[in-house]
Amino acid sequence: ACSGRGSRCPPQCCMGLRCGRGNPQKCIGAHEDV
């Protein structure tokens, strides 16, 4: 289960990253607020 709001998170978002709001393809650091 990926954290974040995107439904098309790339696999690396499942490894401590989250998907950026408005751009589910873009990973951002888990410390950033989405």
From Swiss-Prot:
**Recorded domain comment:** The presence of a 'disulfide through disulfide knot' structurally defines this protein as a knottin.
> Pfam families from the xrefs?
Toxin_24
Q: Which SUPFAM superfamilies match?
A: omega toxin-like
Q: What is this protein called?
A: Mu-conotoxin GS
Q: Where in the cell is it found?
A: Secreted
Q: Which cysteines does the record link by disulfide bonds?
A: 2-14, 9-19, 13-27
Positions of modified residues (4-carboxyglutamate): 32
**What GO MF annotations does this protein's record show?**
sodium channel inhibitor activity; toxin activity
Q: Tissue expression, per UniProt?
A: Expressed by the venom duct.
Q: Which residues carry this modification: 4-hydroxyproline?
A: 10-11
List the GO terms this entry assigns under cellular component, sorted alphabetically: extracellular region
